[in-house]
């Protein structure tokens, strides 16, 4: 059943966002193509440019809910690959995707993820994680940087040499410092702004090769 939203109860900014969302080309395309969110096209474009996710690979998707990146990555790795998704939020099941609900910082959850990896190696770590934004960069940016640091720590703990981290970043305070720190552990870091990212968005994606 559709949810009715009364415009009079929305602020001007919320109403503008809702109109932008409904009119968004990628939102409409995602609904048509069966993706859970428009973010799917960001990963599709990134992989078209980098060809990092391939058939038979093992991929871990951090902060996976609602699952659009898992949909894309699961298709890319194919039947012989492994896609492990994890989020503190619930996520509806997807074919050939192993979902582990919980905080990957916790040893129990981390161990469950690695148990699914088994004797394979993690080829790619994905992170489309973002905080619930307050619209205040002084609050939002530190929260985002913290999530980025968590993704980097996970990647360093799991990726072999040559493995890749694909991670969303908000451009702002702390990003250059984090990039400099990562250069000690990653041989190459590339930035991509996919076409599916809204022009006004501060988000970019880093592709880091260990």
Swiss-Prot record:
EC number from the UniProt entry: 2.1.1.166
Major site of localization recorded for this protein: cytoplasm
Catalytic activity: uridine(2552) in 23S rRNA + S-adenosyl-L-methionine = 2'-O-methyluridine(2552) in 23S rRNA + S-adenosyl-L-homocysteine + H(+)
A GO cellular-component term linked to this record: cytoplasm
Catalytic residues (UniProt): 168 (proton acceptor)
Claim: Isomerase is one of the keywords in the record: no
Protein name per UniProt: Ribosomal RNA large subunit methyltransferase E
Family assignment from sequence similarity: Belongs to the class I-like SAM-binding methyltransferase superfamily. RNA methyltransferase RlmE family.
Function statement: Specifically methylates the uridine in position 2552 of 23S rRNA at the 2'-O position of the ribose in the fully assembled 50S ribosomal subunit.
Superkingdom of this protein's organism: Bacteria
Protein source organism: Psychrobacter cryohalolentis (strain ATCC BAA-1226 / DSM 17306 / VKM B-2378 / K5)
Molecular functions per Gene Ontology: rRNA (uridine-2'-O-)-methyltransferase activity
